[in-house]
Amino acid sequence: MKKVLKWTAYVLGSLILFIMLASWYFSSKFNKEFEKVIDYTPDAIIIPTDSASVDRGRVLSVSCRSCHSVDLGGKVFFNDPSIGTLPASNLTRDKGSETEHYTDQDFVKAIRHGLNKSGNKLMIMPCKSYSHMSDADLGSLIAFLNTLPKVERTFDKRKFTFMSQVMAGAGLFGDMFHYDLIDHDNVKNIPSVIVGNTVEYGSYLAHVQGCNDCHKKDFKGGKSPDPVSPPVPDISQTGSVGKWTSEQFIQTFRTGSTPEGKVLNGEFMPFSGLAAHTDQEITAVYNYIKSLK
């Protein structure tokens, strides 16, 4: 009996030690990535000043509101005692904000490459999607940001519980740093795609909007990259969208309700970004999805 107890204590002790070491390793791994400074200077792009370009930037910026608030003055992205606190930055260059001293090139670095002004990796920022954005559209987006009135809003620094650091380091929160997912040498001098209801433009817009980040490459959905979010629906030919007309697809984004009567939850399905575009552009995304086999 003593021998059994001895071995049981040995196994339990080893297991506890393993868990402690693994937790320390994953926590350290996360913090190392979080604190790493990357020396990277992106290629400069042309920032237009004409009203048409600024308005195009306004349309593109609607996608940013889900995280950065309607006025783009930032907001607390999440605040959970079990996970921690993470604010989404104030993008208006207000005094004391993370973007106060941002240049146009710093915004290119952040939006296209996932790095802040200091060279730290941005968390949860969907830069992989924005890395598909053409130079012209990215320039228009930054041109619009340059017109924003400053919003006086500051936040406490981001902080994470030890357990959330362990989970993030173990990859349980999905891809936290999109910088690591981007081929930085190939996201430069990106040509524009002619706006129209074509499959080509639909592919461009779907990738910029990040549809495939959640709905997967084949748009068949599945498990969400966010462990606390519900499963992602199939929007390919084999899903409900495959049965919709282009008009129904457009109305879904315009009203936030599907033909089947399901109300879209903007927290998990940020449909407002695509809804800001014209019927022709939304039709292009529909045509692109319908073209997938």
What feature does the model see in each segment?
Residues 71-104, 121-134, 160-175, 216-250, ...:
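Gly/Gly-Pro-rich "capping" loops immediately C-terminal to redox-active cysteine motifs
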